[in-house]
């Protein structure tokens, strides 16, 4: 229904909110169970750019950021929001420290260049699924 709203330019899937609404234990279960695939196919049909969140760091997070970022490329995502854990301002108060954290965006951009030429998206999708099942204890 949302894809028919007039004036809609882009859609962002809030994985945390959606996973809570669906009673999931972990927000990336929505990648593993095909929910995101199903949604983005509808957005593609409607010609709407889309994205989903969130990305911590390439190595950080329960599900490594590299795996999440590669899923963005597999699914044709046009945007991602950095997660709170990327730069937790409740813990990081020093501006210099914040600047250092954001310098890591360079490594994310470099990894994106690799993703643009990747041919192992299906392999990554399976790895994500297995990792998520392990995280949620199934």
Predicted regions located by residue number:
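Expand to "…catalyze enediolate/carbanion chemistry for C-C bond making/breaking, isomerization
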Residues: 1-138
């Amino acid at each position: 229904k949302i894809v028919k709203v007039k004036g809609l330019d882009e859609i962002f899937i809030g994985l945390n909110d959606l996973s809570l609404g669906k009673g999931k234990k972990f927000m990336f279960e929505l990648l593993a169970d095909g929910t995101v695939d199903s949604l983005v196919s509808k957005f593609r049909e409607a010609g709407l750019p889309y994205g989903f969140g969130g990305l911590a760091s390439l190595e950080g997070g329960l599900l490594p950021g590299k795996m999440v970022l590669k899923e963005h490329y597999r699914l044709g995502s046009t945007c991602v929001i950095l997660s709170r854990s990327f730069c937790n301002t409740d813990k990081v108060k020093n501006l210099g420290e914040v600047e250092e954290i954001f310098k890591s965006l360079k490594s994310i951009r470099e990894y994106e260049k690799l993703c643009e030429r990747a041919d192992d998206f299906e392999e990554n999708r399976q790895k994500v699924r297995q990792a998520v099942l392990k995280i949620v204890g199934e």
